[in-house]
């Protein structure tokens, strides 16, 4: 996979800046976000508009363990198992973080939250299903903008771990 040259007007986000600084190869994908697709969610919209399998496109969710907030990255086709996420980070339990907290700590809006370039660094757990792909897509830091990269590169950049945290 080769690094895509940014086209005029594509801009950058903290997510792409972090990838560039880490020297990681990635691609950028843009699509026109529409509120008409919100019954399915932002991630499903991205998968459909970009022509990718829903198991290959991942969403970023933030949870609170009581002592810290952690980030889970799971396929848009499923849900995050909060018990499995808590176990992966050595906590007893986890609950979804308030969206306002997630936006404040990540620096992104809901529907555009990326695990990359977050304002506050969090432990990150990637669902193990990502490892079957050479490239996964996730939010590039704004609605209608995704980045594609190798899941092992994502783990390296974020110092993340994998665990079976996705459910279908």
What does each of the following model-derived ranges do?
Residues 1-168:
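Extended, low-hydrophobicity, polar/charged segments
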């Amino acid at each position: 996979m080769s690094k895509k040259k940014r086209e005029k007007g594509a801009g950058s986000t903290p997510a792409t800046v972090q990838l560039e600084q880490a020297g990681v190869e990635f691609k950028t994908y843009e699509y026109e976000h529409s509120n008409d697709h919100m019954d399915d969610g932002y991630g499903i919209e991205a998968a459909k508009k970009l022509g990718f399998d829903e198991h290959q496109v991942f969403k970023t969710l933030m949870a609170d363990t009581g002592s810290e907030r952690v980030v889970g990255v799971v396929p848009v086709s499923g849900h995050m198992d909060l018990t499995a996420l808590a176990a992966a980070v050595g906590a007893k339990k986890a609950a979804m973080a308030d969206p306002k907290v997630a936006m404040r700590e990540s620096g992104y809006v809901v529907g555009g939250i990326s695990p990359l370039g977050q304002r506050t660094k969090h432990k990150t757990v990637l669902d193990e299903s990502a490892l079957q792909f050479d490239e996964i897509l996730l939010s590039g830091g704004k609605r209608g903008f995704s980045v594609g990269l190798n899941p092992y590169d994502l783990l390296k950049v974020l110092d993340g771990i994998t665990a079976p945290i996705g459910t279908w």
